[in-house]
Amino acid sequence: MSVKEEEIKKFSSSVKMTRHDTPMLDELENGPWPSFISGIKSLRDNHHEPRINKMTNDLLGQLEHSYETRKGYWKGGTVSVYGYGGGIIPRFSEVGDAFPESKEFHTLRVQPPAGNYYTTDSLRQLADSWEKYGSGLVTFHGQTGNIMFIGSTTENTQHFFDEINDYGFDLGGAGPCVRTAMSCVGAGRCEMSNINEQKAHRLLVNNFMDDMHRP
């Protein structure tokens, strides 16, 4: 174990929280396939940010409760950022009193760049911003083709959007708007390319995103 790993383990063990028992979820870690439960547990047990430890702990607690009762406890609502009529999937917990750290767990859908081409710097920026304001759970990419940033409070939804918008990313894919825009890498990879795919992508995104922007 590296020095950094030891520091993270020591730090996370000092976080004052009672880990929820999750015998049913534990079963999902068995078998040959990667488990999303293992990923959430890793954030709960190993992340250096106490807010994320607690948030993912209560997320696991609520999910175990759902498995026990065979009922979902997420309800919708209205959450948005200034000037937008979509891009956010609101999630409020009906059992927030029992699991207060995850009682608000909204998802932000963010438009991917043309060709799904990311620099390592942009990925680090997104990850750092999400660790600052969200749960640390990210999906590349959701069913709509967007980046899914899963698990934010209502207040931090605005803060996270403001930060990523400053370095060029925009919302999309949820609500009364076009789900996403996709394009191939184009001339950067294909000998048969005969248009500027990235420019076409950009023009279409700008056109349809206007439908989502609100004064």
Predicted regions located by residue number:
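Charge-rich, low-complexity segments
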Residues: 1-94
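N-terminal glycine-rich anion-binding loops that anchor highly charged ligand groups
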Residues: 89-105, 133-136
